[in-house]
Amino acid sequence: MSRRGTAEEKTAKSDPIYRNRLVNMLVNRILKHGKKSLAYQILYRAVKKIQQKTETNPLSVLRQAIRGVTPDIAVKARRVGGSTHQVPIEIGSTQGKALAIRWLLAASRKRPGRNMAFKLSSELVDAAKGSGDAIRKKEETHRMAEANRAFAHFR
């Protein structure tokens, strides 16, 4: 048993313009090679494009997209008796949001398009509407968990 106490969970800081933690989480995942100002630029341009496309509050579109992509359950590989089973496990809200953000960014990077801001805005709008690669990834994960429901007792 470890003598150390449990680590405190850090809360995400909010970004300077929108004062939103979700925006900051997204910026930190867009970030490459420590270029945070570029990550902010990409996200703010994407938010502007969302504003132009939907003519609604872009933060509500962002929230709706992340809520739509957030998985409730996922599968985890568990080795039992020489064979590996995909065991369905429930996911907490923080981990679910992190997964959703990761899937949204992966889907937008895969998209054909001019620049990252354009691709990200398109993916976020699609996810808010309930379509797109990120939504497909969530549904696929849920299907996998449902198919492997028999192994839930290995948790």
Curated annotation (Swiss-Prot):
Main location: plastid
Statement: the UniProt record of this protein carries the keyword Plastid: yes
Keyword Glycosyltransferase attributed: no
GO molecular function: rRNA binding; structural constituent of ribosome
Assembly mode: Part of the 30S ribosomal subunit.
Function: One of the primary rRNA binding proteins, it binds directly to 16S rRNA where it nucleates assembly of the head domain of the 30S subunit.
Coiled coil: none
A Pfam family: Ribosomal_S7
Name of protein: Small ribosomal subunit protein uS7c
Matching InterPro entries: Ribosomal_uS7, Ribosomal_uS7_bac/org-type, Ribosomal_uS7_CS, Ribosomal_uS7_dom, Ribosomal_uS7_dom_sf
One Gene Ontology cellular component annotation held by this UniProt entry: chloroplast
Organism listed in the record: Cornus mas (Cornelian cherry dogwood)
GO biological process, one term: translation
Lineage summary: Eukaryota, Viridiplantae, Streptophyta, Embryophyta, Tracheophyta
Family membership noted in the UniProt record: Belongs to the universal ribosomal protein uS7 family.
Protein's cellular compartments: Plastid, Chloroplast
Swiss-Prot/TrEMBL keywords: Chloroplast, Plastid, Ribonucleoprotein, Ribosomal protein, RNA-binding, rRNA-binding
